[in-house]
């Protein structure tokens, strides 16, 4: 399939031939949901820890005798009913990782990119270079595309673009090798350079 390529310097629009497997696949909602959930789950620390009544500090003696005090009966000061007592169903450290193999991950990424193209939320540009890390220069370039909140995907690490976009609200920059499904799904619009498209195609093939 062919994608239209926009240019900031010249008016003539060109096209870029890409693989259907990477940018023209059908949208698999169930797979995308599974991969996104697995990615988010993998980011959880899983370090939450609470103490049970067995682990919390305190005496094991009965606080007062069973009958005759007028108070409610109590067998331990470490009861979950008591202040500073243990937790009834205490949370323990756990691993939230969900298994997703490479084939599933690549298929989900291709599915998301293809759907973004169909919705016209993905714009390909020939290049995006800044002579200096100036926010104004980047803002003027993006203004020509008439986009709101945008995720910029570039090939490699461009210091000028990273610095220029740092204080722009609604603009984020990501390398094509490290872009993830959550960033793609959350993005309102996406601007991708030609080099980044080729890198994504290699990554998903």
From Swiss-Prot:
Gene3D superfamilies: 3.40.1370.10
GO annotation, cellular component aspect: ribonucleoprotein complex; ribosome
Molecular-function GO terms, alphabetical: rRNA binding; structural constituent of ribosome
GO terms under biological process: translation
Keywords: Ribonucleoprotein, Ribosomal protein, RNA-binding, rRNA-binding
This protein's record includes keyword RNA-binding: yes
A Pfam family the protein falls into: Ribosomal_L4
Superkingdom, natural source: Bacteria
Region feature Disordered, mapped onto this chain: 44-79
Function, in words: One of the primary rRNA binding proteins, this protein initially binds near the 5'-end of the 23S rRNA. It is important during the early stages of 50S assembly. It makes multiple contacts with different domains of the 23S rRNA in the assembled 50S subunit and ribosome. Forms part of the polypeptide exit tunnel.
NCBIfam families in the record: rplD_bact
Family: Belongs to the universal ribosomal protein uL4 family.
Subunit structure: Part of the 50S ribosomal subunit.
Protein name: Large ribosomal subunit protein uL4
Gene (UniProt): rplD
């Amino acid at each position: 399939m062919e994608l239209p390529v926009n240019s900031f310097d010249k008016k003539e629009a060109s096209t870029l031939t890409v693989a259907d497997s990477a940018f023209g696949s059908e949208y698999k909602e169930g797979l995308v949901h599974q991969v996104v959930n697995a990615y988010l789950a993998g980011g959880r620390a899983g370090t939450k820890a609470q103490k049970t009544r067995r682990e919390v500090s305190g005496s094991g003696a009965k606080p007062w005798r069973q009958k005759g005090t007028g108070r409610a009966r109590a067998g331990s000061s470490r009861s979950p009913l008591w202040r500073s007592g243990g937790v009834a169903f205490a949370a323990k450290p756990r691993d939230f990782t969900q298994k997703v193999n490479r084939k599933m991950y690549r298929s989900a990424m291709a599915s998301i990119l293809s759907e973004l193209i169909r919705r016209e939320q993905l714009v390909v540009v020939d290049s995006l270079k800044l002579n200096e890390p100036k926010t104004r220069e980047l803002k003027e370039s993006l203004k020509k595309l008439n986009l709101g909140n945008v995720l910029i995907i570039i090939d490699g690490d461009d210091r000028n673009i990273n610095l220029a976009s740092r204080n722009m609200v609604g603009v984020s920059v990501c390398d094509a090798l490290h872009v993830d499904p959550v960033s793609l799904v959350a993005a309102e619009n996406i601007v991708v350079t030609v080099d980044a498209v080729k890198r994504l195609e290699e990554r998903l093939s």
